[in-house]
């Protein structure tokens, strides 16, 4: 009796990723790394390879390609997923892989005046999003994915769902954003109403929620605060729906605002988060509070901002100034 036909390897990977409800970004990244791994070994099938070939590829990324530690870790995760979840081949722990060293770099931080200059040069919805990122310490993807129900005006707080590491947290809602956010939400819900009348209006929901609350996708509270300006086709389901504002559009707007402000620091949307943390510590807030607002698992991650505060030898008089 012949073995049942199996779909191509990459299609099997895609199906397994979707079965586990990983994000589209993770799906795209894993498939890309698996393709690179196969091409690196001259199109040999991964089932005919093992830990040695995985180690060779990951070591090559560090020794020859000089990739960052986070890049190597993503490649390793993709290959471990391939072997364990798709091919059902257990690999021994890859202790002998040359690891990319994560450099000890201080985060780029803007002064309060520089933040003000940048925010003044952002326009439209990007201006509000920029103020929200700086005012709450959100990551950019947390900002664009914010849902209406998670802006709690009465409590002056924002609930940040499923952040990095799949953890929810709460951050402060600045008083200066109360009115602009109310206006933005009114506009977002008006757009949602138009989508409903056009026969659409089903926002994307995580799989478990979509199964548990099948009607939630059309409810106002689940809509994005920053909806995309147009509807698009969901690449997985084929459903026409309105996604959230794209992060790349804001990144471009931020780069332009930094240039227009005459700031030479390599500031990005993440810089607003770094500046939020540093300015809170500079204002005297304790590091544990800042840790919770940022959603760091370990306080040592938050400690990097204390090094920024100490930069420049505060309290030390340069010998040059004594000449």
Label the model's feature ranges:
Residues 1-323:
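Conserved catalytic core of the tyrosine transesterase superfamily
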